[in-house]
Amino acid sequence: MSAATEPTKEKPVNNQDSDDEDEDIDQLIEDLQSHHGLDDESEDDEHVAAGSARPVPEELLQTDPSYGLTSDEVTKRRKKYGLNQMSEETENLFVKFLMFFIGPIQFVMEAAAILAAGLEDWVDFGVICGLLFLNAAVGFIQEYQAGSIVDELKKTLANSAVVIRDGNLVEVPSNEVVPGDILQLEDGVVIPADGRLVTEDCFIQIDQSAITGESLAVDKRFGDSTFSSSTVKRGEAFMIVTATGDSTFVGRAAALVNKAAAGSGHFTEVLNGIGTILLILVIVTLLLVWVASFYRTNKIVRILRYTLAITIVGVPVGLPAVVTTTMAVGAAYLAKKQAIVQKLSAIESLAGVEILCSDKTGTLTKNKLSLHEPYTVEGVDPDDLMLTACLAASRKKKGLDAIDKAFLKSLISYPRAKAALTKYKLLEFHPFDPVSKKVTAIVESPEGERIICVKGAPLFVLKTVEEEHPIPEDVRENYENKVAELASRGFRALGVARKRGEGHWEILGVMPCMDPPRDDTAQTVNEARHLGLRVKMLTGDAVGIAKETCRQLGLGTNIYNAERLGLGGGGDMPGSELADFVENADGFAEVFPQHKYNVVEILQQRGYLVAMTGDGVNDAPSLKKADTGIAVEGATDAARSAADIVFLAPGLSAIIDALKTSRQIFHRMYSYVVYRIALSLHLEIFLGLWIAILNRSLNIDLVVFIAIFADVATLAIAYDNAPYSPKPVKWNLRRLWGMSVILGIILAIGTWITLTTMFVPKGGIIQNFGSIDGVLFLQISLTENWLIFITRAAGPFWSSIPSWQLSGAVLIVDIIATMFCLFGWWSQNWNDIVTVVRVWIFSFGVFCVMGGAYYMMSESEAFDRFMNGKSRRDKPSGRSVEDFLMAMQRVSTQHEKEN
């Protein structure tokens, strides 16, 4: 905007004073080298999707920059496009709490509570209700603590804006900005809406870290897009608003987050699946019991007591509580390793992750620009090259960009250049010029010689030298070849030249810069490969930079431009080809937020469990969509809120450590679930047959105690010594059910033998003395408690020593069960010590049989083939379905654009 068209200011706008004194160069270098890069800015300019969910017609974006909109036009546009704020859906917390009482296991527990109340069995009623509320409370608290992502996104937005209305500069609340408004941008302004720069010949720098997580300010010129929640770091300009509210980039990110959060978690689906099958088995067993009871004309009260007993034992009432406790203990352990778990089910998901979609900056690299080996023209001293490059830099700490900081910090390797630098006096400094693409400084040497130092785009620096005198062909060719080589490898290269006194320009060389890989990343990537984890890089950097980083890290170099994916429409490839393309690629460069979301979605549709790392607002949708969303060190609040796990330690190694721990936790959960399903099947089979054949059942109070003891003892599984699998682990439900069924049958046979051999008329094992309820209670408790020692081991039960917590918990429960049997608590008659010893010996025999059976099933390939435990990817891929779904998505996208 020219001075002639400058609008009248109704309210002055404060400008920050940047005319501070030059700082001492020695102090500046020492300061930079002592901070270890904490203030370094990243070179990775993450791209942000332009456009909006609700496009504004171009004719509404032809506002006169000198006059702005009229008040009437503002009113019309606000009525059409609404306020400049994100829509918010409030959630009823009470309804959310009630949702934790819905599910197959919960339904059975609720039915059992109603039955217990009807039978006036208040002890059982209280125990069941207590378990129900405990499960719901733990789940609700975990979900509530995750926080509101939309609230975090809204925190990044501006509160007010300076706009041109009716030819005047006025300050208005940010939510009153409308499409077509002309906004004034200057140092420190937080941009309240998406827009486009309309000031000709402008040059401003904008901090988009609230969106991308990247700290390096982005250069913007006339016609470039700006985005809501970004901050102007340097320069002044005017912009026209192109999108507001939900149609801005931040608004669309919030919408994608809500979309991603709509589905139920993977672990919830697994538990519901197990609960559904157990519910069906309970119904089948109850039908058998009811038919037998009606045949014998049992009274309704007796039938209801049988029903209550089957209902209590048929479903593992403590399953949610034990699994939640196991994950909570694991989360506390991860917290010690600086990994904060915000969603407990993420631990289970992380254990099964096969593909990690990782950002580059800060995770794979140091997020710290550094100087690589400089290229010097023949005959030039490297110290002269370094000295000239550092002379062409600001002496103000606030004026230093990331490249200047990298050069100054590298002086530690060039002591002669560092010593000479302090002897030069800065006469003039001209910051980066977007037209000439170079930085210029005029200095005075200790001898009083005037020297012009320049650094900038290599070919522009070369042109500056050639304008004065020709360069030898071999020097020019070698220089250009080196620049081309560095560009192909993804380095950011700067040419350096100088002019001493009245002499000619001298081309000195090229300074290559790059964000280097972290020291431990290559080793960690190799370790990840051995753990069966594929790492795909998703970065906003250029393809060359991505490929060079992958080469240094030992990752695959099949890196493609994300344009081939398309934005929302999937590009031009058929759905099946697109899925193959994403599956086989090692990563994508120049990605937009929608690309990240699409990559995660496509891999999930192929049956993979996917983890995604991110640190910016633009990562929030894909973090929420992924099976495990990981917010890396330094992430924005919105990214942290969207993530399942937040890492406080930098680098990929922290993620790999957490993955190992999660696999240990998964092993504990898997062994418990096998154990607990076997227990439910055991009592369903035994009690169902006992009731149907002999019209008898255990005392209902003892049934409740058996259910409680089974879970109380195994709560300590959360502290057990567990190995981690060398490959991703998943819920192979067919194999799990096969093992549980066989173990349950062995347990039922053992209990049936106890029932039918210990109470024969003449000379039974217990010689017809004592209480059948007490004996059965002890035998069931012992064999069930000991089963956990079998399922927890990766090999034979003696191959792994359990933790003292688990051993102690089982021993305490066994002692209590023995006291029940000895003193006849809730079983009417006491039993002598000989009876108890015989039950212990017999139970150990059953334990050994179960141990042998479990080991054979674990090691048997034939059993695996029989159970056919395959993942979704082993099934026909359904390529025609993928093609159809992608075609429908493109039609939907095109329809949205047309409307």
From Swiss-Prot:
Q: What is its main location?
A: membrane
| Cellular component terms per the entry's GO annotation | plasma membrane
Family matches, as InterPro entries: ATPase_P-typ_cation-transptr_N, ATPase_P-typ_cyto_dom_N, ATPase_P-typ_P_site, ATPase_P-typ_TM_dom_sf, ATPase_P-typ_transduc_dom_A_sf, HAD-like_sf, HAD_sf, P-type_ATPase_IIIA
Please state the Enzyme Commission number of this protein.
7.1.2.1
Query: What regulates the activity here?
Result: Activated by high pH or also by potassium ions when the medium pH is low.
The stretches that face the Extracellular side, renumbered to this chain, are: 118-121, 295-305, 720-735, 827-838
So where's the catalytic machinery, residue-wise? Answer: D359 (4-aspartylphosphate intermediate)
Membrane-crossing segments per the record: 97-117, 122-141, 273-294, 306-328, 701-719, 736-755, 806-826, 839-855
What compartments host this protein? Cell membrane
Q: Which reaction does it catalyse?
A: ATP + H2O + H(+)(in) = ADP + phosphate + 2 H(+)(out)
CDD domains tied to this protein: P-type_ATPase_H
- A GO molecular-function term, please? metal ion binding
- Which residue stretches does the UniProt record annotate as biased composition, category Acidic residues? 17-29
Which residue ranges are recorded for the region named Disordered? 1-72
| Source superkingdom | Eukaryota
- Tell me what topology the record assigns in the membrane: Multi-pass membrane protein
**Residues the entry annotates as binding Mg(2+):** D615, D619
**Topological domain spans for side Cytoplasmic:** 1-96, 142-272, 329-700, 756-805, 856-899
Q: Which GO terms describe its biological process?
A: proton export across plasma membrane
Fetch the SUPFAM superfamilies from UniProt.
Calcium ATPase, transduction domain A, Calcium ATPase, transmembrane domain M, HAD-like
Instruction: Recite the UniProt keywords alphabetically.
Output: ATP-binding, Cell membrane, Hydrogen ion transport, Ion transport, Magnesium, Membrane, Metal-binding, Nucleotide-binding, Phosphoprotein, Translocase, Transmembrane, Transmembrane helix, Transport
- Role played: The plasma membrane ATPase of plants and fungi is a hydrogen ion pump. The proton gradient it generates drives the active transport of nutrients by H(+)-symport. The resulting external acidification and/or internal alkinization may mediate growth responses.
Give the family, as the similarity comment puts it: Belongs to the cation transport ATPase (P-type) (TC 3.A.3) family. Type IIIA subfamily.
Q: Which PANTHER family match?
A: CALCIUM-TRANSPORTING ATPASE
This chain belongs to which protein, by name?
A: Plasma membrane ATPase
Q: Give the organism, scientific name.
A: Kluyveromyces lactis (strain ATCC 8585 / CBS 2359 / DSM 70799 / NBRC 1267 / NRRL Y-1140 / WM37)
The gene designation is PMA1
